Every structure is written in structure tokens, then in C-alpha cells.
Amino acid sequence: VAEPLRPEEVLARVPQRPPFRFVDELMELGDERVVGAYRWDPQADFYRGHFPGNPVTPGVLLVECMAQCGVVPLAMHLFHRDLPADEALRMQTLFTDADVEFSGIVRPGERVQVVSQLDFYRRRKLRVQARMTREGGEVVCSGKLAGIGVLS
């Protein structure tokens, strides 16, 4: 059985890179729960058009942030735990489904935290219940997200 990956090791392996990387930190990583965070870059190009003079982070990017802070790191952790090392390293997690409700907005420069709890895991498929909050604890969005591991 392999040693569990440390959060910083998982963070280094998350494949997304700027400008499409929406996870800065993993504060907690276990078999059933992961906690991650991201600060939205106020200079990000998408804010120029969404919405001019009153910029708001697009909901689709909030969902992507939830996946990068929750589904991807949790899948990496579980694959590392359950698969041969060479196979786990070649596993790519694809985001497959989301059912998310929005209850707030995120402005440029805000930091969000995502708490994801494992709901289902079998045959390289997983589903989490995720919740995104602002630094003050206000819930921005929550719901179920799913992914699957494929060999790359």
C-alpha cells in the first residue's frame, strides 16, 4: 500500500494550468473529504466582458473551480491509494456532470473555499457533494459533481 499523497503533492499534479487553473491551495485531503481554496484574479480577461462595469465571476467557472478543488484532487488521492503506482500516475480525471445551485456571486479578487465530501466511488467513477463559500462563510453555490478516471 502506497503512502498517501500529501496535499501539496496532489496540488502539483493537478493538470490544469493558468489561465485555466482555479485551485491555489488544498488545506485538507482524505479518503472522503477535501478542502481547497482559490483567489479569483481581478485581472483575468473574462471579467472585461462579464459584466463591464460590474464584473462577476461566471457560474461555469465557479463550477470548474469546484471540480478542480474537489473532484480532481479527491480522485487523484483515491487512485493513488487503490491502483498500481504507474497506473495512478497516468490516470486523468475528467469532469463529467454537475447539478449545482447558485445562491450568491463572486467578485474579482475574492477568495473562495470549496469543501467536497465523497458521495460515491467505484470503478474509477466518483461523485462528491461540494459547497463553495466566501471567506466570511456565505455559501455561493453547492451541489453534486462527478468525474471519471481515464488512462492517458
Task: Report each predicted region and the residues it spans.
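Helix-adjacent hinge/juxtasegments
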Residues: N54-F79
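Hydrophobic beta-strand-centered segment that forms part of the acyl-chain substrate-binding groove
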Residues: P4, V71-V115, V140
